[in-house]
Amino acid sequence: METQTQVDPSKIMQIGTGFFASKTLLTANKMGLFTLLGVSPRSGRDIQEELGLHPRSLYDFLDALVALGFLNRTGIKQTSVYSNAADSDLFLDKNKPSYMGGILEMANNRLYPFWNDLETG
């Protein structure tokens, strides 16, 4: 009897859309969000004002970071309060000696553009 191999597109989709998660993390790090939240939890409105974020995409951006496990959230929309997840707090807060976000800054500023232009280059 012949065994059929199960074909699954999940790897294709995971890799093909992997930049969604990557760019979300890189952007939050570049903005200093994790350092801001390392001081104390903040409401979405406070984060918007302190980092100059556009209100239209504010909660989508913050909640994407919650879904990815980089932030914690209590409440919803205007009552939301955000804080760093444990690993984000330890490794992505510039005020801590354990900060390793510099490699993410380099990836965002230097490497991401190279990969973005891969087909021309």
Task: For the regions a language model picked out, list residue spans one by one.
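N-terminal accessory segments
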Residues: 1-121
